[in-house]
Amino acid sequence: ALPILSHYYDTDPNYRNKYIPILDVIEELATKFDNQERYKNSRVLKSLSTSRKYRYLNTSLQEFTRSKYHRDFTKYRFRDLTEKFLQDFVVWIQVRAAKRGNTGDVSGKLRKLKAVCLYAKEQGVYNVNLNAFGSFKEKLKHRITTPKGVSPEVMQQIESFDRMLLTKKEQFYLDLFLFSYYAGGMSAIDVCLLTRDQIKDDQIIYERTKYDKQARVIIIDKAADIIERYRTEAYMNYVFPTIKRCNPTQQKLYGRVKRINEKVNETLQKICDRCSIKSRVTWGTARSSYISKMIDEGFHPLQVAELAGNSPQTIYRHYYTISDKEKMKGKMNDIF
């Protein structure tokens, strides 16, 4: 006769929890981030985008186990999370991503899954095997993003675009992009939530929403002109007419920023089409273009890092791109 394990009938939830399915731990982490609050620029924000990524990981794993093993992911415990499982998961992501024409963010998913294992181990869950990630060291590294910057000539074309060809709202969306470019490549959420108390004399001092970094932006004349243009249109204490409600929920706040981001990108696409600009220009282009221009103009990386709210290493790894390769080639020919 088979021995009956004493803990089989144990009803103590703390004890049974040691054999919790992977899916439940991921959901537990997502809920934790749902409720995790951060204080940024006099505003309490929750980590909703992080919790969404964990839920997306859960969905991906459910699709993977159904497709590859014809098994329901709800039945998977941490003992099932082996090196072979991870290898199969990586290949499945890559094959699916190739069909969809993207990268599938393999490293992002693996890092999240490893974070789930670390969290489970801290909680005392049984059979967590962190060694399974041993052969994925390269894939666990942060993927170096392709710089999205464009040449100063392209930015000049966008700046000098005939505004008569744009509606009043499109002119506003263009101004948000240009302001971001002039103000250290400020992200969409930071521009939309920018308030007057963050402006000190000729500087904008703010904590970046996405990262724990403070930026100290010098307000150049072109940026000051855009601020002045919307002074009478902005609501409450905001610099731009972006947020219209007094105390919107964070869901509505993020939704509003996302819609404005989309409108800015649509306006930029319209301008690029009219000017026959082949480069892909989005709101995110402003940051790389600003950083690349500043470094090419001879500003010290430490100065640029303070203005943009980054470290010099991050600037070179993620944002800097050679803006004028022909000019560089000419100089190199002279040197050699």
Task: Identify the residue ranges that each predicted region occupies.
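Short, basic (Lys/Arg/His-rich) helix/loop patches that form interaction surfaces
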Residues: 166-168, 233, 265-306
